[in-house]
């Protein structure tokens, strides 16, 4: 079963939430003693995941990949999370 753009974006919400929580100083996702290096790696992984999701598009007319990149659905929360994550990495790298 091919997922819809809406389903793909809904599945990416966890990455948005994690990036925003870390940026806001909420580290409850992590066990005590996690280093800044580990936190940064998680932020980077989630930024990369969101970038892959936002770039999703079919390669040709026969490709069933949903066209997230070309969709007119509001993706601002995802693009904002990417920018927030990148800034966090700059500030805490």
Language model segments and positions:
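Charged, low-complexity interaction regions
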Residues: 21-36, 57-75
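Short, intrinsically disordered N-terminal pre-domain segments
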Residues: 1-25, 90-93
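Short, charged, amphipathic alpha-helical segments
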Residues: 40-44, 66-83
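Short amphipathic alpha-helical heptad-repeat segments
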Residues: 11, 35-51
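Heptad-repeat amphipathic alpha-helical coiled-coil interaction surface used
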Residues: 16, 47, 54, 75, ...
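Soluble, cytosolic/nucleoplasmic coiled-coil alpha-helices used as oligomeric scaffolds and tethers
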Residues: 60, 88-91
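Generic alpha-helix initiation/capping and coil-helix boundary signal
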Residues: 5-8, 50, 74, 78
């Amino acid at each position: 079963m091919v997922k819809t753009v809406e389903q793909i974006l809904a599945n990416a919400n966890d990455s948005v939430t994690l990036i925003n929580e870390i940026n806001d100083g909420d580290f409850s996702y992590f066990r005590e003693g996690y280093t800044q290096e580990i936190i940064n790696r998680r932020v980077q992984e989630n930024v990369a995941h969101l970038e892959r999701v936002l770039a999703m598009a079919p390669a040709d007319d026969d490709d069933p990949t949903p066209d997230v990149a070309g969709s007119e659905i509001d993706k601002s929360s995802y693009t904002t999370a990417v920018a927030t994550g990148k800034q966090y990495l700059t500030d805490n790298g």
